[in-house]
């Protein structure tokens, strides 16, 4: 995954707030995955148009006290891609 990669939710997968779980979850045909606050903050920015660099920039602006989230965001998005929650493509 590169910073120029564009990430999007796979068909049938979506992020939503689940009151019963008191957290954000990824819903998908086979079930759901409960997310922590950090994962939800990252995935809220996944829209199929933004690249990884834009997501990182927005999170660095939103959470300046974190001291740079670049590596953590890339690592999480790679895991989300491996879990098949999101797709990753290079811009055309």
UniProtKB/Swiss-Prot annotation:
Q: What's this protein's family per the entry? A: Belongs to the PqqD family.
The answer to whether keyword Repressor applies is: no
What is an example of a GO molecular function annotated in this UniProt entry? quinone binding
Any idea what job this protein has? Functions as a PqqA binding protein and presents PqqA to PqqE, in the pyrroloquinoline quinone (PQQ) biosynthetic pathway.
What processes does the entry annotate via GO biological process terms?
pyrroloquinoline quinone biosynthetic process
Pfam name, any one: PqqD
Native organism? Klebsiella pneumoniae
UniProt pathway = Cofactor biosynthesis; pyrroloquinoline quinone biosynthesis
* Source domain of life: Bacteria
- Protein name, entry field: PqqA binding protein
Which proteins does it associate with, and in what oligomeric form?
A: Monomer. Interacts with PqqE.
């Amino acid at each position: 995954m590169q910073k120029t990669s564009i990430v999007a939710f796979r068909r049938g997968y979506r992020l939503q707030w689940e009151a019963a779980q008191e957290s954000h979850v990824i819903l998908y045909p086979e079930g759901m995955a409960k997310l922590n606050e950090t994962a939800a903050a990252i995935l809220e920015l996944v829209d199929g148009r933004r690249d990884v660099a834009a997501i990182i920039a927005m999170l660095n602006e939103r959470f300046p006290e974190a001291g740079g989230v670049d590596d953590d965001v890339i690592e999480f998005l790679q895991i989300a891609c491996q879990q098949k929650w999101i797709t990753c493509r290079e811009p055309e």
